[in-house]
Amino acid sequence: MHQPPVLRVARHTDMHAIWQIDVNVFGEDVYPGFFFRQAMDLWPELLLVAELDGKLLGYALGGLGQDRSQGWLLSLAVLPEARGFGLAERMMLQVEQGLLALGIERVRLTVDPANPAQRLYFRLGYQQLAEERDYFGPGEDRLLLEKRLG
């Protein structure tokens, strides 16, 4: 990559490409396509994409929790060929700024204990709150992480 990808808020025309990134990165464990459209309707400023030369390379999705002081990083995905250039970090920081602008004080996320992305999360200041067994069903354990914003 000669020039850095542009980070921007997702558009309706990005929905299929976002879903394809999800399938490419997560395989069978993906959100249904309609979820991204609904997320865009709920939190338009928190669904970001990374784009280079008209191609989407990744996305990040933030959302609001039931506790209005708490937000979530619901999903983060970068295509394998676009990894190693800091896209995930850039997108996470922009989602965090979007949450902060909405008055959110804390952001949480869950991550598979075997996912190497957790190194990024800890480096960005996330702290482990718990390890929850079977979070998404049998054998789907997750670490619950949180970061204070601001």
Question: Predicted regions: what is each one?
Answer:
Residues 108-110, 122, 127-144:
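Conserved catalytic-core motifs of GNAT/GCN5-like acyltransferases
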Residues 2-5, 9-83, 92-94, 98, ...:
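Acetyl-CoA-dependent GNAT
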Residues 78, 111-112:
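Short amphipathic helical patch at the helix-1/turn junction of helix-turn-helix
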